[in-house]
């Protein structure tokens, strides 16, 4: 499948880079969190509160399965999507996976800078929780086809496009 799948921690810039990549490549943008909100007609915060995290993770798996037969998409995943149910391996089947690796210190700055009320797992700006999440997820994220370790927006875009073209054999 010829999709780009962006993975990484919450606050790593997946949605922002995804929007720009979709414009550059003329691909449709799919934000998995937004898609789930539309499917459920509820915010993620409400879904977690009413149905729980397991239900939300089932919806993520439904989305992965939906895109197994589609191409020309930039898919921006929720931070936990690759982690659960060994989804990282399923994501690699639907496209070129890109881990946006942002240093923990930068993620903490981003979290503290803005209140992330819509992200149920980041409520209360708990830096210890974010640090623990980072440690628990990094090994799985690093199974992506490529890792982008750049906090510079423009350079990240260029690097992703180059790596994707190389992966496609262009």
Curated annotation (Swiss-Prot):
Top enzyme category: transferase
Positions bound to ATP: 11-16, 119
GO terms under cellular component: cytosol
CDD domains linked to this entry: SK
Keyword tags: Amino-acid biosynthesis, Aromatic amino acid biosynthesis, ATP-binding, Cytoplasm, Kinase, Magnesium, Metal-binding, Nucleotide-binding, Transferase
Binding-site residues, Mg(2+): 15
Cofactor binding comment, as recorded: Binds 1 Mg(2+) ion per subunit.
Example GO biological process: amino acid biosynthetic process
Cofactor list: Mg(2+)
Gene Ontology MF terms in the entry: ATP binding; magnesium ion binding; shikimate kinase activity
EC number: 2.7.1.71
Catalytic activity: shikimate + ATP = 3-phosphoshikimate + ADP + H(+)
Compartment(s) where it occurs, according to its Swiss-Prot or TrEMBL record: Cytoplasm
UniProt-listed SUPFAM superfamilies: P-loop containing nucleoside triphosphate hydrolases
Zinc found in the keyword field: no
Pathway in which the depicted protein is active: Metabolic intermediate biosynthesis; chorismate biosynthesis; chorismate from D-erythrose 4-phosphate and phosphoenolpyruvate: step 5/7
Family, similarity comment: Belongs to the shikimate kinase family.
Function: Catalyzes the specific phosphorylation of the 3-hydroxyl group of shikimic acid using ATP as a cosubstrate.
Descriptive protein name: Shikimate kinase
Lineage: Bacteria, Bacillati, Bacillota, Clostridia, Eubacteriales
């Amino acid at each position: 499948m010829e999709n780009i799948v962006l993975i990484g921690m919450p606050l790593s810039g997946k949605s922002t880079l995804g929007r720009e990549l979709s414009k550059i490549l003329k691909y449709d943008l799919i934000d998995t969190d937004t898609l789930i909100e539309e499917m459920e007609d509820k915010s993620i915060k409400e879904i977690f509160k009413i149905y729980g995290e397991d239900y939300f993770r089932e919806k993520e798996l439904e989305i992965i399965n939906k895109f197994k037969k589609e191409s020309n998409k930039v898919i921006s995943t929720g931070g936990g999507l690759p982690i659960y149910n060994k989804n990282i391996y399923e994501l690699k089947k639907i496209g070129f996976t890109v881990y946006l690796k942002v240093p923990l210190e930068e993620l903490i700055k981003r979290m503290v800078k803005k209140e992330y009320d819509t992200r149920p797992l980041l409520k209360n700006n708990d830096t210890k929780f974010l640090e623990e999440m980072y440690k628990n997820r990094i090994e799985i994220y690093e199974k992506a086809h490529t890792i982008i370790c750049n906090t510079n927006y423009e350079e990240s875009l260029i690097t992703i496009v180059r790596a994707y073209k190389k992966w496609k054999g262009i």
